[in-house]
Amino acid sequence: LMKIFIFIFCLLFSNFLNAEIISNEQDYIIDEDAKVRESTDELIVREITIDPETHPGNALYQDNCAICHDGSIQKAPAVNWLEMLIPQALFRTMNDGIMVDQSAHLSEEEKIQIVEYIVRKDRKDFPKEAELNYCESKRMKFDLREAPAPYGWGYNTSRFIPKNSGKIDSKNVKKLKLKWAFGFPYSQRARSQPLFAMGSIFVGSQSGDIYALDVETGCVKWNFSASAEVRTGIIMDEWKNGVKPKKRPYIYFGDILANEYALDAQTGELIWKIKTDDHPNATRTATSAKFEDILFIPVSGLEVIPAFNDDYECCTFRGGLLAVEADTGKVLWKKYSIPVPAKYSGTTSVGTRMFGPSGAPIWTSPNVDKKRRYIYIGTGENYSTPADDSSDAIIAYNIDTGEEVWRRQTLAGDAWNLACMGKALPNCPEENGPDMDYSASSILIDLGDKDILVAGQKSGSVYGINPDNGEIIWSKVVSGGGTQGGIHFGMASDGKVLYVPLNDMKNTHDGKVWLNRKPGMHTLDTETGNILWSK
C-alpha cells in the first residue's frame, strides 16, 4: 500500500511540474503615488530642445511623412522608430538612402526642420562630426589564422569562457589596466556585443556604424554605415583556429529597423542586406546564430510603444524566426511565434479598432541543438487581447524544415503594452500584463546521461526543460521579478552551475511596486535547480 501511495504521489508531482503554467498573479502592490509613464518621450535617450507642437518641422512632417510613418503603410518604419535615430542617420536616408526620391522636392532647410522635429532637437544641439582614428597601413592587416573565439554566443548560448581561453581570474583581475578606449561617435549608449577575431574587434553602435578595430591599438581598420542603430551582437563565419579559412569570412548583424546584413569582414563591403519583416514596428535585437552555412535570425517588435496612443489600432505584429543562406541572404524558411495573423477583435472604449492575438516577440538569440537538429527560441508577452499560448514560451523548431516540434508556455494570460503603464489607457489589453518575457537565451547543457534546456524568465523563475519534448523537469522561483526585473539578458553555465543575474527594480513606472526583489547574482545546480549561493 505504501508503494502504491508513493507511486501516486510521484506521478501527481511529476504532472504538476510538467504542467508548469502559472497564473498571471504576481507579487506586487499598487502604489497610487508611484511615478507612472506620462508619454513615450521618456523612452528616448535624449534632451528635448525644441517645442514639437510649434516647430515648423511639425507641419512639414505632417505634409510629407505622416501618411506613411504614422502607421498606414506596412513597410514604413513607424515614427517612434524614427525618433530613436540620430540626425546623421535621417539625413543619410533622405540624401543618399531609401528616401531620396520622396525627399527630392524638399530644400535643405526643410530637411533640417523635419529632422529637428523628429529628433526633438535644435540643429545647434546635433552631434558634431567626428574624426575617426584610422589605422596606419601596418595595422590594417587581418590575421586570418585567428578564428572567432567560440564562447557559446551562437550555438548553445552558454556564455562560458574556459579559464585557459579567458586567462582572467579572481587573482589577476585587479591587475588589469586600460590599454586603449574607443568612443562611439553620435552615440549615447553601447549595446552591441563585440566580436573578437583576426586580431580585430568588430562592434556595432547606436549611430548604425559598424567598426573593425585593431585589437592592439583601437584604431579603425574600416567602418560601415547601416540604416539605423545596431543593437545586436556581431557573429562571423567560423573556421579552425591556426589555419586560414577556405573562403573570405563574412560578419552578420541586424539593425533596429529589422534589416539583416552580411559584410566582408576584411573590407567592410556589403555582401547582402534583407528586410526580415515587413511590419513597421518590427526590429532586430537578438544576435543571430549560424550553423552549417545557415543563418538563423530572430525578429522582435516594439508595437507596444505606439499602442500607448489611444488612436493606434493595436496590434498586429508577430515574432518571427528566419533561416537564410549565409552566403546569399536567400530566405529558406520563416516561422511566426503566433502561427496565424491577428484578426479584428472589436473596438476600444474610444472606438479604435483592435486586433489579436499579437506580439510574442523573440528577444532571445536562437539556441542551436546540433544533436537533435532543433533550434530553440523564447518569446515575450502578447500585445493585445486575446492572449494565446504563444506568449512567454519556449518553442523548438526543426532546423531543416522550420516545422514546430514543441512549445512550452510557462505563464498563461500575459498580454501587455505601454497603455497599461499606470493609467490603463484604452489600448491596454483586458489581461493587463504582467509582461513576463523570455528575454534571456536558453542554454542547452550536457549532464552526461541526459541533456537539459535551461530557460530564465522576467518573472524571476528558472526552468529545466527536457529538450526532446518540452516537459519541465524542474522549476525554481529565484525572485519576484517584474516588468523590468527578473532575468532580463544573459545567463551563463559551465555545465554544472547556472549563473543567473537578476535585475529586480522597485518602481518600474507602471504604478506597481514589486515585492520579493533579489537583484544580484544567483547560482543554481543545473541538474536539480537548487540554489547554491546568492550575492
Locate predicted features:
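Extracytoplasmic/lumenal domain signature
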Residues: 87, 170-185, 210-230, 235-282, ...
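Electrostatic cytochrome c docking/interface patches
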Residues: 22-60, 131, 138-139
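Extracytoplasmic electron-transfer domains, predominantly the class I c-type cytochrome c fold
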Residues: 27-31, 76-124, 374
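Short, solvent-exposed loop/turn elements at domain surfaces
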Residues: 75-76, 157-163, 187-192, 211, ...
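Boundary at the C-terminal end of the N-terminal hydrophobic targeting segment
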Residues: 17-19
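Blade/loop signatures of beta-propeller domains
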Residues: 33, 133-179, 337, 342
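The canonical Cys-X-X-Cys-His
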Residues: 57, 61-72, 90, 114, ...
